[in-house]
């Protein structure tokens, strides 16, 4: 854990809709809006096996070029890279993060986010476009239907679990 006395910890309130999608209320004066590459401990990356970025576009100062530096370093050290995303905060596009996406092993956008980023509506076209950026496994969350997965071996839908009440 790194403590920066100049940053307030971000507080997020997560809201879950009936279809299981989540949205968050975030303090724009917290660390999520101020984190940058100087806060990344590259020595610790060398010790890990998986780098999981909770959300591309969540920290505006971790832009595409910055993520590309972090992800390429992680790949050089044999890490598996996973990344989720949120809707772009500053109008970013797929092309803004293209350099970083080529390093991602598992990418977890939801359908709405993926449609916005690709300009497509058809699940297959959305997943194919994301896959074309070099992502190894596109795992698109499709609400109550489950996940649409696209990789070099093809496509499959993993159905959502039924009868589970989230607490």
Describe the residue ranges of each PLM region.
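A short catalytic or substrate-binding loop motif that flags glycine-/basic-rich loops and adjacent residues
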Residues: 5-7
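Short alpha-helix plus adjacent loop in nuclease-associated cores
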Residues: 9-12
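A phosphate-binding catalytic loop at a beta-strand-loop-alpha-helix junction
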Residues: 167
């Amino acid at each position: 854990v790194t403590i920066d006395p100049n940053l307030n910890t971000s507080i997020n309130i997560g809201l879950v809709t009936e279809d299981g999608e989540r949205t968050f209320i975030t303090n724009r004066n917290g660390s999520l809006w101020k984190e940058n590459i100087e806060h990344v401990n590259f020595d610790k990356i060398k010790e890990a096996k998986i780098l999981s970025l909770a959300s591309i576009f969540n920290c505006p100062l971790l832009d595409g070029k910055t993520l590309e530096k972090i992800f390429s370093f992680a790949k050089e050290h044999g890490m598996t890279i996973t990344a989720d995303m949120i809707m772009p905060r500053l109008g970013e596009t797929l092309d803004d993060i293209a350099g970083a996406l080529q390093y991602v092993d598992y990418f977890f956008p939801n359908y709405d986010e993926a449609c916005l980023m690709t300009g497509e509506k058809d699940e297959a076209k959305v997943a194919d476009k994301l896959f074309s950026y070099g992502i190894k496994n596109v795992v698109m969350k499709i609400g109550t239907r489950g996940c649409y997965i696209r990789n070099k071996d093809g496509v499959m839908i993993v159905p959502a679990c039924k009868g589970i009440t989230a607490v």
